């Protein structure tokens, strides 16, 4: 299910927004980066939500 292209998309987004981790802080809510934005800020969740959620 996790294709390399989709994973690269996540990393690209993270790099674009300046956050490290999956999907960036804005889309991922910070559950991938932890250093970008605090968790709970991820109101704008992308389709990567269910894929990148560790919990």
Swiss-Prot record:
Keyword ATP-binding: no
Renumbered residue ranges of the record's region Disordered: 18-55
Taxonomy, superkingdom: Eukaryota
Ranges of biased composition (kind: Basic and acidic residues): 44-55
Protein's UniProt keywords contain Methyltransferase: no
Name recorded for this polypeptide: Glycine-rich antimicrobial peptide Pg-AMP
A Gene Ontology BP annotation from the UniProt entry: defense response to bacterium
Sorted UniProt keywords: Antibiotic, Antimicrobial
Record note on quaternary structure: Monomer and homodimer. Might act by homodimer formation.
Ranges of biased composition (kind: Gly residues): 18-39
């Amino acid at each position: 299910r996790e294709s390399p292209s989709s994973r690269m998309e996540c990393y690209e987004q993270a790099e674009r927004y300046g956050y490290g981790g999956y999907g960036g802080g804005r889309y991922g809510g910070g559950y991938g980066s932890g250093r970008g934005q605090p968790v709970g800020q991820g109101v704008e969740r992308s389709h990567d939500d269910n894929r990148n959620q560790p919990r």
